[in-house]
Amino acid sequence: HCRLRRQRQMCIRDRYKNAQMTTSIRNITIIAHVDHGKTTLIDNLMKQSGSFRENEVVDERLMDSGELEKERGITILAKPASINWKDSRINIIDTPGHRDFAAEVERVLSMADGALLLIDSAEGVMPQTKFVLAKALKQGLKPIVVINKLDKADQRADEVLNETFDLFVSLDANEEQLDFPVIYASGRSGWASNEIDGPRENLNPLLDLVIDHVKPAEFDKSKPFAMLSTLLYADSFLGRSLVGRISQGTAKANQQIKAINLDGEKVDEGRSTKIFRYEGTKKVPIEVGEAGDIVVIAGLEKANVADTICDTEVDTPIQATPIDPPTMSIKITVNSSPLAGTEGKKLT
């Protein structure tokens, strides 16, 4: 047992060592209307890119890990994953498609260098498509349009492409954004093609398009470490875990760090007890996280979303994108009316 455990640990270390030698990182988010196939597409991207062992049992909709997500069949929380393709690592962020969870989409766009805009080839442009695309364009992202579910009998890919172009124009996209690449796919069947009637073999054309079209952002690794906290997870062992893209410098395990809010006030200070990176859907521990990568940091119990996690010598917070205020707010308090307690017993 000990020998097998040591061999397994050596294999894992070799994997991580090789992963750290990747030449570039692409951070992309997948945005779409609800039920247009984001999570199913990611499932097949992970399987075809070799993220799982041959003998590993893989669930459907593996990104939907929450009980409520599995029960409802929808994505509620944004979640990162990672795949290695050729000489690059692609961090993929799955986002909710339902408008009730739109704030999740807004937050994760700040971590992305590019976006895949998925559109159902039969349903076409839907209300949430417009919302998420507007947010992506405002961030300056240049989306790749994926016309999905092309295996449907009632697909109308050409019309949907025209609808999509009209949507870009109506949202005041610039010339670079209007010159968006298009690829046709079936996430469920696991293929993508540059032409409607092109070969339908695998998802390699989509991964190649991501590498060619999404340029990795440039970061200064010589500056002190700083990262905008974008997602927050609770861990029964490590406590509060903060997810974000490192904006500058490098994050190291057991490094003295602090959290500052948008006003530059210190919220918390401590040591980064653990640093993780995503390999597939799993979190794997690393010693050093570099600028541009999406990492998970544990060790700060008071830090929150939109706080800047940084080296102790950093004083300037990273500006977070303001999230749209709620359409309606409700305040529930104790009934302090003079007539409180005088209601009748029969309530119906």
Could you describe each region identified by the protein language model?
Residues 1-14:
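Single conserved hydrophobic/aromatic residue that forms the stacking wall/gate
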